[in-house]
Amino acid sequence: MKKRAVTLLLCLVLVVLSLLRGFAASAAGITPATNADFDVPCAAAILIDEDSGTVLYEKNADARRPIASITKVMTLLLAFEALEAGKIHLDDFVPVSEHAYHMGGSQIWLEPGEQMTLDDMLKAICISSANDAAVAVAEYVGGSETAFAEMMNVRAYELGMTNTHFVNACGLDEAGHLSTARDVALMSREMLLHHTEVRDYCSIWMDTLRGGATQLVNTNKLLKSYRGITGLKTGTTGKAGVCISASAERDGLRLIAVVLGSASGKERFQAASTLLDYGFAHYESAAAALPGDAPQTLPVEHGTAATAPLNYESPGHCLMPKGEGGTLEAVVELPASLSAPVAAGEQVGRIKILHQGTEMCSYPITAAQNVDALSFRYCLRLLAQSLLLRN
């Protein structure tokens, strides 16, 4: 009875405390190499770990430059996001405008008024870097290429691409159309982390369109020469030079190498291979097991349930120097209790991954279900039930 009376009193007070703030996954203890350590044949470059975003190498990574057809990574990102939102569909027929028809550079020779499925358009962009297809998709998603370029800039801002400005959807040289190696890595990582289907398109070596009449050959020659390559996008223009954003995976370690402003295709692929080789030679993706005594629930104060079940995201993998992954330790950090309301999916703690006492990365612990705060209506119902039980 005392416990019920206290609960009823709390109902009247309706005290609601703030939940713990979330913890972001991160990697620590890694010092990136630079061109002072070793150089690659290009104007700017960066190598990052895809999972954590940790920079492993950089050279003039914040220098603003044209990026040629690597621009299409953002075009593809917006297209895949529209697909995910159900705004467009792979079997939609995308019309070709006069504007798209007049795109120069690499193309699949689309004709004004021609229609092609979005799926085929995406193949043309990913495999053959078709400018006409990129602009047609941009117009289909955004209404016009100009409007789509604004969408690209908004998305770039959201991703923290602070040194990027897009003017077109395909990457042809145009005044003010600029980015950096670091920003390219950011958008490449966003694409690869959240739209993994792009790997399926980018890993196709050869395909055909129009019933076999149009042949597509992948512009990323690393597909045939580098073990573990998964993408992503090449680019070449007079002002940008020869460029690539290359992604690769070996033994669970996923890397992204961005190379801008090489003098030739050979040097571009050489630079990307050198960066990826460096990453795979010096780092590994290591895991730590979750402690066996990790709590499965937490007490909840002022809630309609006494406890909240917990959802432990996998301790996953941490980026580690090569050969040092075997000493990782997972430590659970949780508060003594939570205060309602608790929302399913909210971060309530974290799994901290330690290496010799130093935190390397962390992963969230979330509430597995909602726990509402005590409400006046709930209290009245509880009071009524109490009175009925007494009778």
Question: Which residue stretches match the model-derived regions?
Answer:
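Active-site-adjacent loops and short helices of periplasmic peptidoglycan-processing enzymes
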Residues: F23-H195
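Generic detector of short alpha-helix boundary/capping microenvironments
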Residues: V6, L10, A33, V40-P41, ...
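Residues in and immediately flanking transmembrane alpha helices
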Residues: V16, A85, A287-L290
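Domain-terminus/edge residues, biased toward the C-terminal soluble/receptor-binding domains
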Residues: M161-H165, D173-L178, R182-N391
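A general, composition-driven signal for non-globular sequence regions
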Residues: L8, L12-V15, P66, W109, ...
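Sec-dependent N-terminal signal peptides of Gram-positive bacterial secreted proteins and lipoproteins
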Residues: R4-S26
